[in-house]
């Protein structure tokens, strides 16, 4: 329910789990070995068509790849207008082979993106619904340098320890990409000379935030592979979009977190410097996503 009352809660959409027909065997941001993050820019005036295409593609992928991959869809609400995000959660890189095989050989899948979806608008499919050349993919794996599970204790077939091993018990259920009401993807580029310290700082920051806001914010750490070296990602799973304000309050008003952030980490130009000295300036971005809602009745 939408409200124009000042201070009223942001109207919430169902969590991404509502996009799925079944929850058994679900792979999420806390259980995946890697996440393929695909982004596409919707052409202006084609938002409803983009949502319909995304739902149909997602439904088919989850049906055909149910044991190997779970795809969840989100819309960017703070950042770039009109961008769709797909998070394809997999256990290992080899599972990507099934996806490629489906794209190349599955006739029903090909019909979804080749058939005429715009008969009343001059014809066409995704190539008109989305801006050409706007699709990009990043591959993220859970940050495993500080995970509580050692690499030699991995389950058979696992790539790295899933992100759930980063998290200490809080007395509240952890949020993940299927249960969160909103998802913030925070991305930052570590300086090469302080790359290990940057990872450790984010681990300390993550641990503090999870303890300070249990059941409200769950932070999980990832890093990019097959892309930019030392580009780090924090997946901030929020109970609702309103809790983005709670995150801001923690970073600006919580004395314990402020002390952690101000703690000298590295020396720059002979001066002890806090967390900012670990990262390339002006590279930290927050992309705020909401789960794609069900179609309107």
Regions found by a protein language model. Name each.
Residues 2-262, 266-297:
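Short S/T/G/P-rich N-terminal loop/turn motif that feeds into the first structured element of a domain
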């Amino acid at each position: 329910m939408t409200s124009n009352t000042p201070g009223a809660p942001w109207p919430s959409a169902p969590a991404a789990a509502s996009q799925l027909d079944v929850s058994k065997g679900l792979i999420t941001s806390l259980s995946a070995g890697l996440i393929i993050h695909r982004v596409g820019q919707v052409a202006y005036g084609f938002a409803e068509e983009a949502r319909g295409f995304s739902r149909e593609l997602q439904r088919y992928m989850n049906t055909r790849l149910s044991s190997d991959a779970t795809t969840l869809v989100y819309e960017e609400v703070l950042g770039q207008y009109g961008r769709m995000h797909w998070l394809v959660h997999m256990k290992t890189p080899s599972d990507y082979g099934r996806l490629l095989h489906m794209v190349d050989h599955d006739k029903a899948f090909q019909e979804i993106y080749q058939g005429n979806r715009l008969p009343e608008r001059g014809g066409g499919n995704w190539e008109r619904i989305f801006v050409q050349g706007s699709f990009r993919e990043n591959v993220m794996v859970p940050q495993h340098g500080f995970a509580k599970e050692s690499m030699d204790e991995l389950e058979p077939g696992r790539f790295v320890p899933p992100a759930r091993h980063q998290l200490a018990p809080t007395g509240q259920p952890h949020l993940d990409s299927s249960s969160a009401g909103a998802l913030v993807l925070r991305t930052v580029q570590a300086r090469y000379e302080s790359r290990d310290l940057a990872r450790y700082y984010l681990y300390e920051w993550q641990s503090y935030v999870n303890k300070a806001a249990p059941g409200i914010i769950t932070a999980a750490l990832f890093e990019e592979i097959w892309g930019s070296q030392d580009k780090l990602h924090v997946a901030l799973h929020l109970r609702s979009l309103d809790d983005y304000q709670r995150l801001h309050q923690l970073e600006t008003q919580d004395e314990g977190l402020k002390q952690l952030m101000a703690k000298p980490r590295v020396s720059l130009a002979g001066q002890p410097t806090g967390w900012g000295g670990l990262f390339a300036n002006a590279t930290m971005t927050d992309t705020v996503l909401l789960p794609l809602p069900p179609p309107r009745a």
